[in-house]
């Protein structure tokens, strides 16, 4: 019985210690871009294991929602796949603090069947015409005789904003050729891999499996081309705070920008800064 009591005492002590640590740790909430989320989640997991002063939690919702969240003091850090817009500055003021966390590229991706049928490259005008609804069949761009299933991102997505700016001419451009709107990069990947005739756009780190990244204006979306700014759809990914960050927020930002965080960025398929 004495041994059993000791075992029970050890278990209870461990549970209480864990509860006390959780209660005493200061929360740091991170929200926003689904593109940046794999880096933030993996970094938060490691950061939470390495220290006991702060507990970082991460959730998606899109760049726009993340920026709104910090401006309204609902979250501490916003993940963003674009820079703050003039509209956001006018609405919330110029108190945003920007932190570069990694590099990425918006990849134009197609279903494996389309890639294998010969569509391994599109130029800017072709992508524009597909999303405008002017090109509706893959045979018009050297592919098979099949309707093009066009996937876009939801309103508020930083990736959508950047894509529209570069391809369509402005962030709020209409895209009448779109068949479905995906809520996040992972959903884009699922939609493309589940179709034999799809096209979509998503972060470089989401390519793989049946989701094939194609060359854009003759340049492939790979590590070297993005790092050297040769790929036109390259971009910077950010954390933002609204005003001076809290000690916990600053500690997490420093971790992500430091050697350990940048190693995680590379492991998650991003290009380190």
For the regions a protein language model found, what residue spans apply to each?
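Positively charged n-region of N-terminal signal peptides that target proteins for export
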Residues: 1-7
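Exported/periplasmic ABC-transporter solute-binding proteins
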Residues: 21-92, 96-273
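Bacterial N-terminal signal peptides
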Residues: 8-19
